[in-house]
């Protein structure tokens, strides 16, 4: 747990959350990396070696049941972690379909490129089949512009 304090301090400099929430998120992220899974039961085993895994599991459940992540806060955190201050970045927007069990999710994702990989900042589930329309794409793009501006934007990439 030597990484816990630097991680929650870093997160605290970007997220306006209480210390217990920052500590939980830090534990959760470390467990996620250590366990290489998103399964809460398995994550609870890697959460705190001195705590009962059922207690850790209930802690995970309570956090996600009672706390609402602000999409803009998470996007700001990700952006501040990967964008070079004063540097340029490429924006990518794409519509894709993911399967969640038997359910097909039609997603519109907007992200920035980091070391050749697009990191999604905003993702919307489109309540329809097929492509997004211009207004949906403009709405996502405007969210990014509202908190980053356009100064460092080198390129905007979209298909079609």
PLM segments and residue spans:
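Conserved, well-structured functional cores that handle cations and Mg-NTP chemistry
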Residues: 1-160
């Amino acid at each position: 747990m030597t990484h816990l304090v630097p991680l929650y301090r870093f997160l605290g400099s970007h997220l306006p959350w209480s210390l217990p929430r920052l500590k939980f998120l830090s534990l959760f992220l470390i467990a996620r990396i250590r366990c290489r899974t998103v399964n809460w039961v398995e994550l609870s085993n890697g959460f705190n070696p001195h705590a009962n895994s059922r207690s850790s599991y209930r802690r995970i459940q309570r956090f996600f049941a009672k706390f609402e992540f602000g999409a803009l806060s998470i996007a700001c955190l990700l952006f501040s972690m990967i964008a070079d201050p004063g540097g340029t970045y490429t924006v990518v927007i794409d519509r894709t379909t993911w399967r969640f069990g038997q359910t097909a999710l039609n997603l519109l994702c907007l992200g920035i490129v980091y070391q050749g990989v697009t990191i999604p900042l905003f993702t919307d589930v489109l309540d329809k089949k097929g492509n997004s329309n211009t207004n949906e794409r403009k709405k996502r793009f405007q969210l990014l512009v509202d908190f980053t501006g356009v100064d460092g934007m080198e390129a905007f990439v979209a298909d079609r």
